[in-house]
Amino acid sequence: MAPSHLSVREMREDEKPLVLEMLKAGVKDTENRVALHALTRPPALLLLAAASSGLRFVLASFALALLLPVFLAVAAVKLGLRARWGSLPPPGGLGGPWVAVRGSGDVCGVLALAPGTNAGDGARVTRLSVSRWHRRRGVGRRLLAFAEARARAWAGGMGEPRARLVVPVAVAAWGVGGMLEGCGYQAEGGWGCLGYTLVREFSKDL
């Protein structure tokens, strides 16, 4: 499917359930890899070992003392990702959310934007997900181009000194990171825990 066969418009009320399922599916595709990445870092392994050692004095089962900290840590990572990316965002100053629609009317992607925290930060992508059945067909790039156009228009209307777009990407989503780098974005830090990055932030001056 060529990008020219796609259109982007605001999400309709009756499309909310479909879009929400798409967001949840997108998070599920990466949450296990992010959890594995986070929990195999040396500081995390030390903390898990210390927690297991402490639980051995409380729990009668050695296996339970070993597995319980891992289970709780994985659950915390997954719940954090689902809360951040697996739900519909409230309407923001940039409008939306928007959906990518094929010529046949099938919704195949979703995008949401929000203003940056401080003046000059530009706009941020808060949701970007493509249905697994429509990936590698130009949907992500079409949504990204739409986001850039919205960010430029918003910056001009607000009198911002520059137009800028920031896209957060889970560390395990290598395909998205490669697409952004191919579109001229640069990785600039991110956030995580214990000194290790779980989400990278890519930015581009427009």
From Swiss-Prot:
GO terms for molecular function: DNA binding; N-acetyltransferase activity. It holds the Pfam family Acetyltransf_1. Its main location: membrane. InterPro entries: Acyl_CoA_acyltransferase (IPR016181), GNAT_dom (IPR000182), NAT_camello-type (IPR050769). It is found in: Membrane. The gene is NAT14. It is a single-pass membrane protein. Keywords: Activator, Acyltransferase, DNA-binding, Membrane, Transcription, Transcription regulation, Transferase, Transmembrane, Transmembrane helix. This is Probable N-acetyltransferase 14. The chain crosses the membrane at residues 57-77. The keyword Translocase does not apply. Signal peptide: none annotated. Residues 6-206 form the N-acetyltransferase domain. The lineage of its organism: Eukaryota, Metazoa, Chordata, Craniata, Vertebrata. One of its GO terms (biological process) is positive regulation of DNA-templated transcription. It comes from the Eukaryota. One of its GO terms (cellular component) is membrane. It comes from Homo sapiens. Probable acetyltransferase. May act as a transcription factor that regulates the expression of coproporphyrinogen oxidase by binding to a promoter regulatory element. The keyword Transcription applies. Its EC number is 2.3.1.-. Belongs to the camello family.
